[in-house]
Amino acid sequence: MKQTVYIASPESQQIHVWNLNHDGTLTLTQVVDVPGQVQPMVVSPDKRYLYVGVRPEFRVLAYRIAPDDGALTFAAESALPGSPTHISTDHQGRFVFVGSYNAGSVSVTRLEDGLPVEVVDVVEGLDGCHSANITPDNRTLWVPALKQDRICLFTVSDDGYLAAQDPAEVTTVEGAGPRHMVFHPNEQYAYCVNELNSSVDVWELKDPHGNIECVQTLDMMPADFSDTRWAADIHITPDGRHLYACDRTASLITVFSVSEDGSVLTKEGYQSTETQPRGFNVDHSGKYLIAAGQKSHHIAVYEIHGEQGLLTEKGRYAVGQGPMWVVVNAH
């Protein structure tokens, strides 16, 4: 398995393309100049395209991915109704979902043969919308509205239209600020990192039409931490054994182990990382974690090891200015 790492740096308007070697080292293969401040990125389900959101002219760009080395070639673009904060797709590669924090909305862009064509639906009134996350069964879109302490739930029609589910939302504790999410591989649990109080909620997905409840909330931060909490990103290993979340103020990654059924998290430790880690990701083998320092302008690679999933730094690399997003593609 070959793996390629893509790093989005909006301040220098670049995507750095790296080969992830089997020993955890990175080899730079391409630097792409992007026509705008590139932030969120996601790979299409068939691994043929990289979709990126850019500003200040709000668009989604599609880059064709070379199957041999992961190199990028521009393919298409489509306008967006708001500034892109987060980008994702459904599992069939039919739609791109874009959350917009500033617009307080989530939009759906239709894909045709993998290329973005047009916006088919927009839902507004989602103050501080920070991500859009489709469940593994491709039936429910979870959309955190950070400023409202709620996660809105939508069904997605065959034409890409969003309809409020029943229940239409789940709520966090006041002041939590739900931000990013991941799902357990067993499809029974979701994990949401809360930006404003730096906590992680475990949501049990008993039934896509109801009976959804928060079964655990864990504080990410060390007991002696007294500064402003500012959590950012969350990812789980492919085997579902280890979960990671980062805080930008403390510049640390919190390490959790996950119970076999996915219902219980145990905090195992902390890893100091690059300054102001806005984004990170885990590779497809579950062996390496790559974190981006928005203020250090570097990325760091960590090896994941042991039953606890603790991290050991393997190396760090200069990238563009203000790196914010990390995507890993296997090909």
Curated annotation (Swiss-Prot):
InterPro entries: 6-phosphogluconolactonase_YbhE (IPR022528), Cycloisomerase_2 (IPR050282), Lactonase_7-beta_prop (IPR019405), N2O_reductase_N (IPR011045), WD40/YVTN_repeat-like_dom_sf (IPR015943). Keywords: Acetylation, Carbohydrate metabolism, Glucose metabolism, Hydrolase. Its EC number is 3.1.1.31. GO terms for molecular function: 6-phosphogluconolactonase activity. It holds the Pfam family Lactonase. The keyword Hydrolase applies. The modification N6-acetyllysine is found at K287. Transmembrane segments: none annotated. It comes from the Bacteria. One of its GO terms (biological process) is glucose metabolic process. SUPFAM superfamilies: Nitrous oxide reductase, N-terminal domain (SSF50974), YWTD domain (SSF63825). The keyword Acetylation applies. GO terms for cellular component: cytosol. It is an enzyme of class 3 (hydrolase). It catalyses: 6-phospho-D-glucono-1,5-lactone + H2O = 6-phospho-D-gluconate + H(+). Pathway: Carbohydrate degradation; pentose phosphate pathway; D-ribulose 5-phosphate from D-glucose 6-phosphate (oxidative stage): step 2/3. Belongs to the cycloisomerase 2 family. Catalyzes the hydrolysis of 6-phosphogluconolactone to 6-phosphogluconate. This is 6-phosphogluconolactonase.
